[in-house]
């Protein structure tokens, strides 16, 4: 069961424009130098009251006429115990606001998620609704704070929909 580390309702850092950034608990990667080590423990953070959470999210996603993106960070949003929550949130938001861009940060590699999605319908569905995926573990020796949406140069910014259409990993930068 997913647990919430924090929510930033008006985040101008994690996505294009303004996004609602959802930081989930639990990360198996434990990258040295991680800026979010408090999210590693899957039992940390707060339990999520899903009906209340989704009501707030629906209200906030286009509050004051600002069309926000939806960003999932962590922790690790694509770890097994976070998949159901991420899938439910994306599915509901895309049903109401289909043009909402979805960003996901993962410490794993995109191609590994594609392989796992062959036998995991929830992960496959998440990827089918995701616009941009930032992949790869944070590597402290490759730290570069000038990079778009990334903390280290080994990480990639992937156009998920173009990648699924072409069968090749399509990087945006």
Over which residues does each language-model region extend?
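Phosphate/pyrophosphate-binding loops at sites that engage ATP/ADP/AMP, CoA/4′-phosphopantetheine
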Residues: 59-65
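Core AdoMet radical
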Residues: 36-51, 65-80, 99-116, 127-141, ...
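N-terminal, charge-rich interaction modules
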Residues: 7, 30, 50-52
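N-terminal [4Fe-4S]-dependent radical SAM core
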Residues: 1-23, 28, 36-43, 169-170
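P-loop/Walker A phosphate-binding loop and immediately adjacent motor/lid segment at beta-alpha junctions
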Residues: 85-94, 143-173
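Residues at the C-termini of beta-strands that transition into short coil/loop
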Residues: 8, 137, 161
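A general structural detector for well-ordered alpha-helical segments in enzyme core domains, enriched
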Residues: 53-57, 85-93, 122-126
């Amino acid at each position: 069961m997913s647990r919430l580390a924090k929510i930033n309702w008006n985040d101008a850092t994690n996505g294009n424009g303004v996004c609602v950034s959802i930081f989930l608990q639990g990360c198996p990667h434990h990258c040295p130098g991680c800026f979010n080590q408090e999210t590693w423990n899957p039992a940390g953070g707060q339990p999520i009251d899903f009906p209340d959470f989704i009501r707030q999210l629906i209200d906030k996603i286009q509050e004051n006429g600002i069309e926000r993106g939806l960003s999932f960070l962590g922790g690790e949003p694509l770890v097994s115990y976070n998949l159901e929550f991420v899938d439910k949130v994306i599915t509901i938001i895309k049903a109401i606001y289909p043009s909402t861009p979805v960003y996901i940060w993962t410490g794993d590699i995109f191609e590994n998620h594609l392989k796992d999605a062959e036998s995991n319908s929830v992960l496959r569905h998440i990827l089918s609704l995701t616009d941009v995926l930032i992949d790869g573990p944070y590597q402290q020796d490759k730290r570069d704070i000038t990079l778009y949406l990334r903390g280290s140069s080994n990480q990639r910014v992937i156009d998920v929909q173009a990648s699924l259409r072409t069968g090749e990993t399509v990087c945006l930068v």
